[in-house]
Amino acid sequence: MSGTRASNDRPPSAGGVKRGRLQHEAATTGSRVTVVLGAQWGDEGKGKVVDLLATDADVVSRCQGGNNAGHTVVVDGKEYDFHLLPSGIINPKAVSFIGNGVVVHLPGLFEEAEKNEKKGLKDWEKRLVISDRAHLVFDFHQAVDGLQEVQRQAQEGKNIGTTRKGIGPAYSSKAARTGLRICDLLSDFDEFSSRFKNLARQHQSMFPSLEVDVEGQLKRLKGFAERIRPMVRDGVYFMYEALHGPPKKILVEGANAALLDIDFGTYPFVTSSNCTVGGVCTGLGIPPQNIGEVYGVVKAYTTRVGIGAFPTEQINEIGDLLQSRGHEWGVTTGRKRRCGWLDLMILRYAHMVNGFTALALTKLDILDALDEIKVGVAYKLGGKRIPYFPANQEILQKVEVEYETLPGWKADTTGARKWEDLPPQAQSYIRFVENHVGVAVKWVGVGKSRDSMIQLF
């Protein structure tokens, strides 16, 4: 037996500690993040839910997207609009973190901050941390975004309906491994300048009409570099410290929504990032075991901006009523949102992908004026129910929606502050959603302000 080890022997663990205990500790130590995600096509009211949870959070994070997102938060009668900044930046006690999965347009970041400063936002620079691995969006990315939309319209007679914020082109540069990151900007500026010029030339070769003021943009970027330098950290280490140091409440604010996810959304009419729960891990550099609560935010009806399949859309007086009562214009684009009945197939699909632990049902008050309310409960193809959400857009356009009709409540719910204040028919509507999706509703929104979110448990 000399020089050999019996088959049931194991090499000693470091320090003689039993391997099983190490594995257990590795799997269970650390805080867990609370995630807020959109469950439809965006504009569900995620910012309001985040604002509610951010009041006692220590860290509020963004993990994907860019300034194509739009979150509105009302505090003390003041309406703040956020696109790139986490809406938790309002909390003076919390650190706001922009993770590596976010693409950052620096001029847009400072413009957004300055607009909100005029409304009362203070000392945001002291509370903002930006991952050094986050990719940059340049002005020419935004110009290319617009040129691509024009091309698509000319070639196919339709466009994707992007926000023209350069998000898709920036993620394309990232995937092509030609993109530039925050850490590159803060390192050797001569090297950064060389790579920036090459990237600009690449885009000009693809789009001959593209004009790029290379020297002007580099001058601006050099100025921005010094402004953001104090905010930049190694993002992975920052999150590791937050998770494994003294216990902290960490909140993740998802941008966009499940049906806009690059993989699971209604492709190609989607955004360019993963806005489902998997994007939290890749966009912040954290392991799955540190995901805790996952809250899905759902509007009490359905809206969508731009083109693409929308099975429950109401192109009639119902759609017009929802649009006008709900003030359905995009925060980022100002575009009118398409409106329709609540679609439970979408919610069940979003739950399959995200594993929601609870839902927030927002804008219930918009339904106050309706005599009856329809809810899409199933899709049919060829007269037969299908148990899945179709990936193919042409098929999704053809589905027949099976509806159930519920009685309206014809009463003002905006003053409700607890479950008992809601009309019985409104309570039945909420329970109907819970039963069909299989997830409990934790909050019900009946207005814009922070105190108009009714907590059920």
Curated annotation (Swiss-Prot):
Textual note on the cofactor: Binds 1 Mg(2+) ion per subunit.
Annotated coiled-coil segments of the chain: none
- The enzyme's E.C. designation: 6.3.4.4
Q: Which PROSITE patterns match?
A: ADENYLOSUCCIN_SYN_1, ADENYLOSUCCIN_SYN_2
Domain of life the protein comes from: Eukaryota
Q: Where in the cell is it found?
A: Cytoplasm
Which residue ranges are recorded for the region named Disordered?
1-25
- GO CC annotation terms, alphabetical: cytoplasm
Pathways involved: Purine metabolism; AMP biosynthesis via de novo pathway; AMP from IMP: step 1/2
Q: Which CDD domains does the entry mention?
A: AdSS
The annotated subunit structure for this chain is: Homodimer.
**Name assigned to this protein:** Adenylosuccinate synthetase isozyme 1
Q: Which species is the source of this protein?
A: Bos taurus
Its gene name is ADSS1
